[in-house]
Amino acid sequence: MKYIYIKTWGCQMNEYDSSMITVFLEKTGRYLITKEVEKADILILNTCSIREKAQEKVFHQLGRWKKLKNKKPDVIIAVGGCVATQEGKEIFKRANYVDIVFGTQTLHKLAQMIDKVEKNRRFMIDISFPQLEKFNYSLEPKKTGYTASISIMEGCNKYCSFCVVPYTRGHEISRPSDDILLEISILAENGVREINLLGQNVNAYRGRTFNGKICFFSELLRLVSEIDGIDRIRFTTSNPLEFTDDIIEVYQDTPKLVSFLHLPVQSGSNRILQLMKRSYTTEEYEKIIEKLILARSNIQISSDFIVGFPSESEEDFQKTINFIKKINFDMSFSFIYSSRPGTPASEMKDNIDLQEKKKRLYTLQNCINKQTMSWSRKMLKSTQSVLVEGVSKKNIMELYGKTENNRIVTFKGSHKMIGKFIKLKIKKVHTHSLQGELI
């Protein structure tokens, strides 16, 4: 029996892929997963390339693993994920001690690649895009808690000027709806209560049914809501361009779909949105939000923002701040623009000083944090339904769970409550977390 250590960086899709790798390898009967890196015979790094810092982080990590390989020459190092797909053979040039490079769509071939390396001691690479082949090998999902994320589609066809996803994950491909529903049903039977549907552009889902018909995302959401045991449904990440009325209508008739939506806008300036090739305007985005509020009056919105995009003026940035206030976003993921090789934006002149970018990022995050706290204060003394997930990491005398709007709540309660929905009264609020007590 050999031990495998997996380190995962990046999005929830990467986390899902790593869980698939675990199931694939353990199913062979030859491997066990370990959390002790020094104990491992095979080291797997599942990578992210969405920003330059994340990419360089990969090679720093590989440098640390090189020291382990110097001590144990038979250790196999495998690099997967988006950096692997983007860099390919260049990884071997920068880190010639790496044995395997596999792509986002070839992780099901990893056991076979490990076998070949062990026999021939030659490096292996497969970063091809065999479409949904990896899901054809899907095995019984592994429960790791009372919430679970599953991939319903991969890739993106939008080709935003700053984004590497179409190059690292391929074009949009949707899993068959019956495969998704079966996987969720198995998870529900094993105690999962909340499901998160994943995709780079999840609302573009167009999966085939068993009789060859198309199942649209709105229909899939309703089908998931009918699965016994699943009481909460989330999804991420969606694109405003395809956030259609039929999806909005699900918020009217499907209470299991949470009143919290992550809908990236990226900028509040139409000029910058055009340069980003986002294919919508702030006015069109605002119209979607207005319809969502009509469908679900208590819905809260989070978003993504990029500051310092090439040629972004102070006026453009101020439009973003004004838009943030107008929509009243609850939370955000916000970043300084990072040029990615091979994207159209990388050819644009980056004429904004780094200190100015940092200043804008600070201003934007400060604005969002004030709004986050404002949303949290509205929850004070309210009663919230919380899915209890486990013992608090900060205080072992307390439990923690999440509200529908993604707030962590800590409280004193019995361990028998873990995995169940309970009612809590909110007694104290912080920006991103809450404290409650049992009713």
Curated annotation (Swiss-Prot):
Spans through the membrane: none
Required co-factors: [4Fe-4S] cluster
Binding positions for [4Fe-4S] cluster 1 per the UniProt entry: C11, C48, C82
Subcellular location: Cytoplasm
Record's cofactor remark: Binds 2 [4Fe-4S] clusters. One cluster is coordinated with 3 cysteines and an exchangeable S-adenosyl-L-methionine.
Main location: cytoplasm
Residue ranges of every copy of the Radical SAM core domain listed in the record: 142-374
UniProt catalytic activity: N(6)-dimethylallyladenosine(37) in tRNA + (sulfur carrier)-SH + AH2 + 2 S-adenosyl-L-methionine = 2-methylsulfanyl-N(6)-dimethylallyladenosine(37) in tRNA + (sulfur carrier)-H + 5'-deoxyadenosine + L-methionine + A + S-adenosyl-L-homocysteine + 2 H(+)
UniProt GO molecular function: 4 iron, 4 sulfur cluster binding; metal ion binding; N6-isopentenyladenosine methylthiotransferase activity
CC annotations in GO: cytosol
Residues noted as binding [4Fe-4S] cluster 2 in the record, renumbered to the chain: C156, C160, C163
EC top class, as a word: transferase
Classification via InterPro entries: Elp3/MiaA/NifB-like_rSAM, Methylthiotransferase, Methylthiotransferase_CS, Methylthiotransferase_N, Methylthiotransferase_N_sf, MiaB_methiolase, rSAM, rSAM_horseshoe
Keyword Mitochondrion attached: no
Keyword line: 4Fe-4S, Cytoplasm, Iron, Iron-sulfur, Metal-binding, S-adenosyl-L-methionine, Transferase, tRNA processing
Pfam families: Radical_SAM (PF04055), TRAM (PF01938), UPF0004 (PF00919)
Top-level lineage group: Bacteria
Domain MTTase N-terminal positions: 2-119
SMART domains: Elp3
Chain ranges of the TRAM domain: 377-439
EC number(s) stated in the UniProt entry for this protein: 2.8.4.3
Self-association state and partner proteins as the record states: Monomer.
Family: Belongs to the methylthiotransferase family. MiaB subfamily.
Function: Catalyzes the methylthiolation of N6-(dimethylallyl)adenosine (i(6)A), leading to the formation of 2-methylthio-N6-(dimethylallyl)adenosine (ms(2)i(6)A) at position 37 in tRNAs that read codons beginning with uridine.
Protein name: tRNA-2-methylthio-N(6)-dimethylallyladenosine synthase
Organism (species): Buchnera aphidicola subsp. Schizaphis graminum (strain Sg)
Originating gene: miaB
